[in-house]
UniProtKB/Swiss-Prot annotation:
Heterodimer of an alpha and a beta chain. It comes from Aliivibrio salmonicida (strain LFI1238) (Vibrio salmonicida (strain LFI1238)). The keyword Cytoplasm does not apply. This is Integration host factor subunit beta. Coiled coil: none annotated. It comes from the Bacteria.
Length: 93
């Protein structure tokens, strides 16, 4: 599902809201989540899951085009861990 598909579905479920209101709300929720993760904080949505940052250690990689070894810096990557309710819904559907 893309962001625009999500907005369309929400508009059809909540016809009293304009498409612009729904779009602005979805964008704001995603922006707040990104800002929270950018600040190094964790996001927990009970029943759905949690978003956090995992650190990837520096490592030696390889350029697939040339085969040369390349040093890769350490970095933080977003990580999602599904909650129990979401795992159960996915496994029983």
């Amino acid at each position: 599902m893309t962001k625009s598909e999500l907005i369309e579905q929400l508009c059809s479920k909540k016809p009293q809201l304009s498409a612009k209101q729904v779009e602005d709300t979805v964008k704001e929720v995603l922006e707040q989540m990104a800002t929270t993760l950018e600040g190094g904080d964790r996001i927990e949505i009970r029943g759905f899951g949690s978003f956090s940052l995992h650190y990837r250690e520096p490592r030696l990689g390889r350029n697939p085009k040339t085969g040369d070894k390349v040093e890769l810096d350490g970095k933080f990557v977003p990580h999602f861990k599904p909650g129990k309710e979401l795992r159960e819904r996915v496994n029983f559907s």
